[in-house]
């Protein structure tokens, strides 16, 4: 099949971006994301092998996917992750492989990942205060994350994007500090609205919600800039003369569904057409039976929803750490 194919959904949107969750396991226990006790260990046959994930990815690239992001859980806890990146990088028609991580293991893997073909990384980081970091992650080391950021910069996994979930009463006093990181560094900081999910429901309240207006009020020197990618969920701003950018991702107050270009593949082989929908398509079963999963995707892609319904209180049942954001 021609790897220059174009994959379109029922609304004429070009779908060219696949996010692969390689594991639902994580080495942190962030309060809004994962239970303190962790999650039950799953049987091996319930999780796709890296070879199976690669096979699905190759099939989707043949249909028109040209960008892949590897996520988790925490993807760097999955054994063989560097090998997966290396194999995917050989895939003709794939232009970019990126990875989202909490950064704890990044100092160990950054150089190998870069050599394997990874282009850049997004790092989840909600505070620059070591004590607050240990609290929100239930025991994590901010120092290790900062080491990972430095190593990623050193080997060229840039521009680095920091994903910061805004939580009222926790890190809203650090907005200016995060923005300051963009001035002299090739780092983009993206502030993300706290979204209501099962694990994070107790954190979800009006008092803890922070909209993008609050960020702009705290840093009035931010100037809006034109986005280079209309499918990006972020609206970007910059302090004049800064090397990096500031992004605002507002799934609650400002939908970005109109230009959605992405699919999500979970570690147990389910294809999600929309992050905020419980609808899933099983690809693991058909793949293991030797069926052509490309035909399944082509049949199902027309059912990708026009938009989410978060504002109506419709929240998905699957935990975010099982999807990869």
Swiss-Prot record:
Its EC number is 4.1.99.22. Residues 10-229 form the Radical SAM core domain. Its cofactor is [4Fe-4S] cluster. Keywords: 4Fe-4S, GTP-binding, Iron, Iron-sulfur, Lyase, Metal-binding, Molybdenum cofactor biosynthesis, Nucleotide-binding, S-adenosyl-L-methionine. S-adenosyl-L-methionine binds at residues 32, 73, 124, 195. One of its GO terms (molecular function) is cyclic pyranopterin monophosphate synthase activity. GO terms for biological process: Mo-molybdopterin cofactor biosynthetic process. [4Fe-4S] cluster 2 binds at residues 257, 260, 274. InterPro entries: Aldolase_TIM, Elp3/MiaA/NifB-like_rSAM, MoaA, MoaA_NifB_PqqE_Fe-S-bd_CS, MoaA_twitch, MoCo_biosynth_MoaA/MoaC, rSAM. PROSITE patterns: MOAA_NIFB_PQQE, RADICAL_SAM. [4Fe-4S] cluster 1 binds at residues 26, 30, 33. Pathway: Cofactor biosynthesis; molybdopterin biosynthesis. GTP binds at residues 19, 69, 100, 161, 262-264. It catalyses: GTP + AH2 + S-adenosyl-L-methionine = (8S)-3',8-cyclo-7,8-dihydroguanosine 5'-triphosphate + 5'-deoxyadenosine + L-methionine + A + H(+). Binds 2 [4Fe-4S] clusters. Binds 1 [4Fe-4S] cluster coordinated with 3 cysteines and an exchangeable S-adenosyl-L-methionine and 1 [4Fe-4S] cluster coordinated with 3 cysteines and the GTP-derived substrate. The keyword tRNA processing does not apply. CDD domains: Radical_SAM, Twitch_MoaA. Monomer and homodimer. HAMAP family: MoaA_B (MF_01225_B). Catalyzes the cyclization of GTP to (8S)-3',8-cyclo-7,8-dihydroguanosine 5'-triphosphate. Belongs to the radical SAM superfamily. MoaA family. This is GTP 3',8-cyclase. The lineage of its organism: Bacteria, Bacillati, Bacillota, Clostridia, Peptostreptococcales. The gene is moaA.
């Amino acid at each position: 099949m021609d790897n220059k194919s174009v994959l379109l959904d029922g609304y004429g949107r070009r779908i060219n971006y696949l996010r692969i969750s390689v594991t639902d396991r994580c080495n942190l226990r962030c309060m809004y994301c994962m239970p303190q006790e962790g999650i039950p260990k799953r049987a091996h046959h319930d999780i796709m092998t890296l070879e199976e994930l690669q096979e699905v990815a190759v099939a989707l690239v043949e249909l028109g996917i040209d960008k892949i992001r590897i996520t988790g859980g925490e993807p760097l806890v999955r054994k063989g992750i560097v090998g997966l990146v290396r194999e995917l990088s050989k895939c003709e028609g794939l232009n970019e492989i990126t990875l989202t991580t909490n950064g704890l293991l990044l100092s160990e893997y950054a150089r190998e990942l870069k050599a394997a073909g990874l282009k850049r990384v997004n790092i989840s980081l909600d505070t620059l205060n070591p004590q607050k970091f240990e609290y929100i992650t239930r025991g994590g080391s901010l120092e290790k994350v900062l080491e990972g950021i430095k190593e990623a910069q050193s080997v060229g996994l840039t521009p680095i994007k920091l994903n910061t979930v805004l939580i009222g009463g926790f890190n809203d006093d650090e907005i200016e500090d995060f923005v300051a990181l963009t001035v002299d560094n090739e780092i983009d900081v993206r502030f993300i609205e706290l979204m209501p999910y099962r694990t994070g429901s107790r954190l979800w309240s009006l008092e803890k919600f922070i909209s993008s207006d609050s960020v702009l009020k705290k840093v009035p020197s931010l100037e809006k800039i034109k986005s280079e990618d209309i499918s990006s969920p972020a609206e970007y701003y910059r302090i004049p003369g800064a090397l990096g950018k500031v992004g605002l991702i507002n799934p609650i107050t400002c939908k970005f569904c109109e230009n959605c270009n992405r699919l999500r593949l979970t570690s147990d082989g389910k294809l999600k057409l929309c992050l905020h929908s419980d609808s899933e398509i099983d690809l693991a079963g058909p793949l293991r039976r030797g069926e052509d999963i490309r035909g399944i995707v082509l049949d199902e892609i027309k059912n990708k929803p026009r938009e989410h319904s978060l504002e109506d209180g419709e929240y998905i049942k699957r935990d975010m750490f099982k999807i990869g954001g």
